[in-house]
Amino acid sequence: ILFMIFHHVFGLYALPAGVDTAWIAPQLTKAAPIFKICVPIFIFITGYAMGWKTNSSPTFGSLIKTGFSHYFKFWKIYFLCLLLAILVSWAFPLPILPSVADMGWKNGLLVVTGLRPCYPDWWYMALFAAATMALYPICAWITHHIAPVPSMAALLGVSLLFQSTAHIPSLPGIAYSFPPFLPCFILGYMCAFLASRLSALSISQSLGAILLLALEILSIHLFSFSKAKTLTVIFLFTLWCLPWITRKLRLTPLLTLLGTYSALMWLNHRFIFGYHFSWDLYGTQSISVVFIVTLVSSLLLAMAMQKL
């Protein structure tokens, strides 16, 4: 969540038009897109969380129900923020943002369901919907009804195939944004699947699974569309070590706090503090002030919204 806020505040396309940003060092604006590593991390965590949610003998219907339930919890947070966004956009209209009132019923329905969010920064909502309600049931059914290691090898191959379509401009909406992050979801799911069943696998199956994980990491590094390929791999490895790191550095309370409100912070920080009040915020000409005010304000707003 810290990386995401930093990326949205100081990214190449985040700086608001008409605001004096000459005080921001050029190297900072060039380095800020590296922080978009938050998207692979989010989708990895989604896959990891979903990998633990499958029972021993699932039906495809039960898997779809589980995926929908997971998405619905997130959607309730999204819908609350959508209502707040509509109120803010009516009170402080901006020409760069779409008006919900001007949308037809089809686009309005897509906005409400989260399949086509009205705010550009909320595009991950559609990615999350595809991951939980489509990709998860398919992955879970395949790995539970076919030998686990061969099925995961097949998923790895499919993920690379879809990732190769990442730069096809004719793919609309979610079909265009999803393929680059598909291997990260598969990796997260594979890690959870193996962690929950490693004791039941034979030695050869365990070695095969470890090899597949290594190939998956390598594929993310070699085929990723992101310029921060090496950082992607480093941070995915860091996620595995996170429990040990947080204990050693005594960061557990802080990370727990940010994790509890991360979804609300992701949805609220940009449309209020990135669009509507950015002129006053960037006018301070202080990187620390802009980042800290955005972070703290977003956290406090998330805590207040959590009580609704």
List PLM regions with ranges.
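Alpha-helical transmembrane segments of multi-pass membrane proteins
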Residues: 2-16, 86-92
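Solvent-exposed interhelical
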Residues: 132-158, 190-208
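Hydrophobic cores of alpha-helical transmembrane segments in multi-pass inner/ER membrane proteins
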Residues: 40-48, 127-134, 183-189, 236-241, ...
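Alpha-helical transmembrane segments
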Residues: 1-5, 77-81, 152-159, 208-214, ...
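Membrane-embedded glycan-lipid processing machinery
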Residues: 31-38, 115-126, 169-179, 222-227
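Alpha-helical transmembrane segments and terminal signal-anchor/GPI-anchor hydrophobic tails
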Residues: 161-266, 270-294
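Structural signal for the C-terminal ends of transmembrane alpha-helices
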Residues: 50-58, 91, 137-144, 164-165, ...
